[in-house]
């Protein structure tokens, strides 16, 4: 069985002091949870202080974005080399980046290559819009996004997060069977794109209104290897509960 990954995406939430308080409030409980990969993705400004708090911890850090150049006249951007000193993971291609900042499949591809070059592990997000879901275009959209994102890459493993846009922040998660079906298809596309071995080793996460009440059902599905958690990751009790339930499932196998 692939190792379960639980990643908390804080998005544009928490001040510096709030971020440090939140991490300190759940650090001890999270460190007691074994067998899964636990990742926190705070805003950029909180990465360094949280890194200090989590020194020698089993809890990993991730960024929410990066730019694809190492340095230069790119005002307001963060480079892979800067992040490499602070964290292990980086979220790339989140639907909010695509919607609000116009990120294309080509840009996502450049960012993945830049992250890998710097030794960062990308968490690549894909997912369909509400109207695409209603029109039966989910598979077509996922295939296009994946092929654009992975163009020119020869990888033995990549982390993918399936986040149907209609489920993000709405409180309306995809049903476990819907998520399982879509993620099964993503694995097929990975097989076609990167080869069967990569498809079998690559963790595929579900994201979209994940909480402590639905995580066990989600992770009990055969194709789902973890979760990218939004709002629930901003509540210490909820995030710890999600990680604890994930570890129970992991340790059964």
Swiss-Prot record:
GO cellular component term, pick one: cytosol
Chain residues that bind substrate: 9-11, 169, 209, 230-231
Record CDD domains: TIM
Domain of life according to the entry: Bacteria
Keyword Thylakoid set for record: no
Gene Ontology MF terms: triose-phosphate isomerase activity
Keywords: Cytoplasm, Gluconeogenesis, Glycolysis, Isomerase
Catalytic EC class: isomerase
Residues at the active site: 94, 163
Pathway the protein contributes to: Carbohydrate biosynthesis; gluconeogenesis; Carbohydrate degradation; glycolysis; D-glyceraldehyde 3-phosphate from glycerone phosphate: step 1/1
Main location: cytoplasm
Translocase among keywords: no
Compartments where found: Cytoplasm
EC id: 5.3.1.1
Biological processes annotated in GO: gluconeogenesis; glyceraldehyde-3-phosphate biosynthetic process; glycerol catabolic process; glycolytic process
Catalytically driven reaction(s): D-glyceraldehyde 3-phosphate = dihydroxyacetone phosphate
Family (UniProt): Belongs to the triosephosphate isomerase family.
Subunit (UniProt): Homodimer.
Function summary: Involved in the gluconeogenesis. Catalyzes stereospecifically the conversion of dihydroxyacetone phosphate (DHAP) to D-glyceraldehyde-3-phosphate (G3P).
Record-given protein name: Triosephosphate isomerase
Taxonomic classification: Bacteria, Bacillati, Chloroflexota, Dehalococcoidia, Dehalococcoidales
UniProt gene name: tpiA
